[in-house]
From Swiss-Prot:
Alphabetical GO biological process terms: proteolysis
Role played: Dominant secreted aspartyl protease that has a clear preference for aromatic residues in the P1' position directly adjacent to the cleavage site and, in particular, Trp. In addition, it generally cleaves peptides containing Lys, Arg, Phe, Tyr, or Nle (norleucine) in the P1 position, Nle and Glu at P2, and Arg and Val at P2'. Has important roles in facilitating the interaction of the yeast with the external environment. Is able to rapidly hydrolyze Staphylococcus aureus protein A, an important S.aureus virulence factor involved in immune evasion and biofilm formation.
Protein name per UniProt: Secreted aspartyl protease 1
Inducers of expression: Highly expressed during exponential growth in rich media. Also part of the 3 most highly expressed extracellular proteases in minimal media. Expressed on human skin.
Disulfide bonds: 321-352
Length: 395
């Protein structure tokens, strides 16, 4: 009999109450922002924006395919699946140097004897690294599973490799036999950051079911005191990933919670943008905010002083930098106003570019809500109670 992840977490939490005094305290991982979508003079690099948009489209396409494979049904928010190139044997030359663009938040981890920075992504569920980063032969605890993985990217190609298990050290915690996918091709073009650690639910993972996402492994092994993690992202320094509990110093006031359905795989919530109801996937792997083009157009056309324009096939908005428009998101009844540094992500022809953009043919009928919002809030991801908590981040 197979138990759901919620049943396992519930059992672990209940069992853990008896030994709470033996559990370590919550731990914090300091995060660094890798690259931005602007040039040195703060001009929007629309080529980089287009690359990230394509990468996100293919990322969600692959995740929705994973969902179908893992559950036997289509995701309730499925819009369409892209015409991907399917290389089932995992062979062939794959040029992925332009994929990812390092637009995530990176922190330190150690698998076996290999230490490196990795991006933490609430919009995916697997841990993958570039070649020549993780060295399994140097680790006595490493095991090659003989299972493979294959992940699609924005140019229609795939990154492939073998899945290993090894001891993981992160933020002072240590877990055994955690799955890591070692790619045979480079898929992140960033010397400092060498991989992605997914923090979504198992329903969207590419790896076989027996290989848990890393945070689920921490929970099952009772390494963390609570099945909770917390992202607080800031412009500049001070961004953190808090594991195993809630750091109240990272936010103002009280957390407001919304329920999530772990069977959907994603951290999805109903919300509002400038009063318009939306479905939102909270994704630390996105630098800006993407939405269905018709919904974004509806929002932009109602914003005072914002002029719609198209670049790279996507809908954007431009405004006078000295007169930033009102842009707010609402979750769990709490509003978050995007400030001057969040409402725009760069400049174009002397004007500021709005930090939301619309795309045609998104794989999901949902908004992908990334950094521009996350820099205003501290967000708690609670796998034990299947909910997300939102509060304004502290100064």
């Amino acid at each position: 009999m197979q138990l759901s992840i919620q049943a396992i977490i519930g059992f672990v939490v209940a069992a853990g109450l008896a030994v709470a005094s033996e559990l370590p305290s919550p731990m914090t991982v300091n995060l660094e922002r890798r690259k931005m979508l602007v040039t040195k003079n703060d001009t929007v690099d629309f080529k980089a924006v287009r690359k990230q948009a394509n990468a996100l489209n293919y990322k969600y396409d692959k995740l929705l395919r994973n969902f179908r494979k893992n559950t036997g049904r289509d995701h309730p928010l499925l819009h369409l699946l892209l015409d991907l190139i399917d290389k089932r044997d995992g062979k062939g030359d794959v040029d992925l140097d332009d994929i990812g663009e390092g637009q995530l938040w990176a922190g330190d981890v150690q698998f076996g004897q290999s230490k490196f920075k990795i991006d933490f992504d609430t919009g995916s569920a697997d841990t993958l690294v570039n070649p020549f980063v993780y060295f399994p032969h140097r680790s006595k605890s490493s095991r090659k599973t003989h299972h493979t993985f294959s992940t699609a990217y924005g140019d229609g190609t795939t990154a492939s490799g073998f899945i290993y298990t090894d001891d993981l050290k992160i933020g002072g915690y240590k877990a055994k036999d955690v799955a890591i996918g070692l790619s045979v091709t480079k898929f992140i073009n960033d010397e400092d950051n060498q991989g992605i650690a997914g923090m979504s639910f198992p329903a969207v993972q590419s790896f076989p079911k027996k290989f848990d996402p890393f945070f689920v492994a921490l929970v099952k092994q009772k390494v963390v005191p609570e099945p909770v993690f917390q992202f607080t992202l800031k412009r500049g320094s001070g961004s953190t990933l808090h594991l195993g509990g809630i750091d109240n110093s990272r936010f103002q006031g009280e957390l407001s919670y919304v329920d999530v359905n772990p069977e959907d795989g994603f951290w999805i919530s109903e919300g509002k943008v400038n009063g318009k109801k939306i479905d939102a996937c909270i994704d630390t792997g996105s630098s800006i905010i993407f939405g269905p083009i018709d919904e974004v157009r509806e929002v932009i056309t109602k914003m005072d002083g914002v002029t719609p324009f198209t670049a790279g096939g996507a809908l954007h908005g431009a405004f006078d930098c000295s007169k930033p428009p009102k842009l707010d998101f609402e979750f769990a009844g709490q509003k978050f106003n995007l400030g001057e540094n969040q409402v725009s992500f760069g400049k174009y022809q002397g004007q500021c570019v709005l930090s939301i953009m619309g795309q045609k043919n998104l794989p999901m009928n949902a908004w992908v809500v990334g950094d521009s919002f996350l820099q205003t809030a501290s967000v708690v991801f609670d796998m034990g109670k299947n909910r997300m908590g939102f509060a304004p981040s502290s100064n």
